[in-house]
From Swiss-Prot:
Source organism (scientific name): Methanothrix thermoacetophila (strain DSM 6194 / JCM 14653 / NBRC 101360 / PT)
Enzyme Commission numbers on file: 3.1.3.18
NCBIfam families from the UniProt entry: Pglycolate_arch, PRK01158.1, SPP-subfamily
Binding residues for Mg(2+): 8, 10, 169, 173
Signal sequence, renumbered to the chain: none
GO molecular function, one term: magnesium ion binding
Name of the protein described by the UniProt record: Phosphoglycolate phosphatase
């Protein structure tokens, strides 16, 4: 039995233009189990989205910020990300999105060799990773993922992660899918995400999310 649903926002609850899908809002509001928003977006954005969805629990900044019933925990170290960006800028033609609202990671504009940049950071022995969310590249603390964030929320709720469904579209969602009891992917998901999923929706974006919830209901999971 599934006791909670963890779901990514961009690309999963939105359309292709990152506009929230009305059908996903309706589906979430009708769910009778707790919903956990798990995203790479900022804390302030995720908090606003939680209000729109009527959700009390979320993980923001790819696991760096956890909030449950307005109790916020910051677990990432922004200074390490700033140091990594300084080194990368000296060697690669990169630019970051300036956001004073980010607490634990940095966001880079796409268009550079991510694999080469990752290897360079490895050579410097900096405990950070580059993560592609499908919309941007994030510099984040190593060991902090959507999976670690979901685990913290599950502990607060007293719900084992194997009783939580995890739904997403990008590789950054895989860590939370791997620890969940029912990993699922929307139709527009990256191939690696589909491979990690137990169920892959035929439909994309918010419509795909609705399809997954319908499947879970039909199977008696929720």
């Amino acid at each position: 039995m599934i006791e909670a649903v963890a779901v990514d926002i961009d690309g999963t609850l939105t359309d292709a233009s990152r506009v929230l899908s009305p059908v996903s809002v309706s589906v979430i509001r009708e769910l009778e189990v707790p919903v956990i928003l798990v995203t790479g977006n900022t804390h302030c954005f995720t908090r606003a989205a939680a209000v729109l969805f009527g959700v009390r629990h979320f993980v923001a900044e790819n696991g760096g910020v956890i909030s449950s019933d307005d109790r916020i925990e910051v677990v990432g170290d922004r200074k390490l990300c700033d140091e990594a960006y300084k080194h990368l800028k000296e060697k690669f033609n990169i630019k970051k999105f300036d956001s004073r609202y980010r607490l634990t990671d940095l966001v880079l504009i796409r268009g550079f060799d991510v694999d080469a940049a990752s290897r360079y950071l490895e050579s410097l022995n900096l405990p950070v990773d580059l993560v592609d969310t499908g919309f941007a590249i994030h510099i984040k603390n190593r060991g902090i993922t959507k999976g670690t964030g979901l685990r913290r929320i599950s502990e607060r709720l007293g719900i084992p992660t194997k009783r939580i469904a995890a739904i997403g579209d990008s590789p950054s969602d895989i860590p939370m899918m791997e620890i969940s009891g029912f990993p699922a992917a929307v139709g527009n998901a990256h191939p690696s995400v589909k491979s990690a999923a137990r169920y892959v929706a035929d439909r994309a974006f918010g419509e795909g999310f609705a399809e997954i919830i319908d499947h879970m209901r039909a199977a008696g999971m929720i």
